[in-house]
Amino acid sequence: MEVYLSEFINWKLYEFKKINELGTSTFRYYFKGKIVNLKNKRVSSNEVCYMFKLMDDTGIVELNYSLSKYSPKFEMLRQLQLGISVFVYSDVVCRVSGIRAWKLQIHSKNLESKIEATISEPEQIPCPGFGSDNIVPLSLVNDFKDGAFVNVLVAIQWKEEFEIFNNETKKSLPKQTIHVHDISGSAMIVLIGESQVKSALSWNNETILLIHNAIAYRTNTGMLELSIKDAIIQTLQSFDGKVLKLLNFSIKRKELIKINAYRLSTLEALEKIASQSGEAFGQVGVLIMQSKIKDLTKEGGLVYGNDLTGLRFADLISIIVDETGSVKNPKFSQKLLEEITNIAPTELSVLNEEQAMHLENVFLYRHYRVCVGFLNKQIYVFSSDEPLKSYI
């Protein structure tokens, strides 16, 4: 995350995942993030609360900003849109409840609390008329109200068989459901009518779709559904070089999206599989939230020289999380820990407490794509290019 100082030299800049670890306190801080979700509600006849989800390279933070409709800042907030980058300045932070439920709360009455847009409007990209700033992960689309228009980039996982659908006029129409994924979640696209079904005949599990103005709904079972009735759709084959360059998507990145859509799992899904079959393995995007490096440094337990201390190195990470839950005390492979910390266990023996704290700052609150194994009531974490049984 970029560091901005200039006239705000006395303000602290926090990456989002560090903000999410702060307790209830009062201090000055500021950060920059991209708006990926935006709602508002009337609190009283004269007060409105804007509810944001802001994203940077380290994660997502939620923010509630309350202000009077007579405030000079009110008109600026009305003009904010998805994709705009904003600065947030505040001297107040408040934890509501739980690691996944709390939000930053600021009010325009706090003179040191404000939101400023860094650009007047989101970047607009020609052909098809929107940019990567406006592409929303499916995990965030779940927070949108039913009927919201969204832009998504998804890979097809599978297509269901054709059905016959009877509409309100009892006219029989062809219907097909297509399941799609991105690296954060899943959804389904329901095609109704001959023209929609025909348009998707060439789609298969190699197809990636860039969809502009899909309409998001929740089904009775809670599944996310995307209506493409009024959408603009580009398939992988129709991306030309100019659009790819403007959207900042390389061929390699498209391949990663496709691979992630098929293979990326969640901690919750693996836990459910393990509860039924006794074991489960998959690739998961996780965030390292807590380590034992502070405690082990004080105990002198970072010295590496025998099996016991080697095991303690494997126990270095206390908590990992993804969007579905958390895991305590996972066993990390030595190879993966060396990749993450960029230090060998033998080098840990010469670190003092201050150096150990600095090392912790290198890997905490960072996203990693790792392999996770649930086996014999233990959770193992390892890199994708090493066999699990090499260290269990």
From Swiss-Prot:
Task: Give the UniProt keywords, A-Z.
Answer: Cytoplasm, Meiosis, Nucleus
Q: Which domain of life is it from?
A: Eukaryota
Q: Where does this polypeptide localize? A: Cytoplasm; Nucleus
GO cellular component annotations, sorted alphabetically?
chromosome; cytosol; nucleus
What are the protein's GO molecular function terms?
single-stranded DNA 3'-5' DNA exonuclease activity
Report if keyword Oxidoreductase is assigned.
no
Look up the record and give one Gene Ontology term from the biological process aspect.
Answer: reciprocal meiotic recombination
User: Tell me, what does this protein do in biology?
Assistant: Has a role in meiosis.
The name of this protein is Meiotically up-regulated gene 11 protein
Species whose genome carries this gene: Schizosaccharomyces pombe (strain 972 / ATCC 24843) (Fission yeast)
Lineage, please?
Eukaryota, Fungi, Dikarya, Ascomycota, Taphrinomycotina
- The gene coding this protein: mug11
